[in-house]
């Protein structure tokens, strides 16, 4: 990691801490920060891995349309490989960058409400490991990230804004 990247990461962590400061104590917001950092790491690792598999086909993981027969076949094949190699699986629309894009969306008619999506994704990460060697490693991994906690905000909209 370069010095610029370290400085940028430090700045982002302080911004997150400043946003959450006053809403909860340091131990509590640490769980959220570390949880999101780990989710981002898993998502980026998944995307890099999937793009490596798809390289020979000239396809990017995020561009796969899961609703088509061909897209579903790609997803199934990648799921099988990822579970064997990485120990978990994320669909393209579950990647951190895609959720962040939806959360930051200002497009009229498109909801930027992501809390429910995040809850499902964090559960799906754990569920994807069921019956694999990595199941114990992912058991209750994100249990300390209560996205419905009123400490994040009194209303779902306020919590969504913080997230």
Describe the predicted segments one by one.
Residues 1-163:
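Non-catalytic, mostly N-terminal accessory regions of nucleic-acid modification and defense proteins
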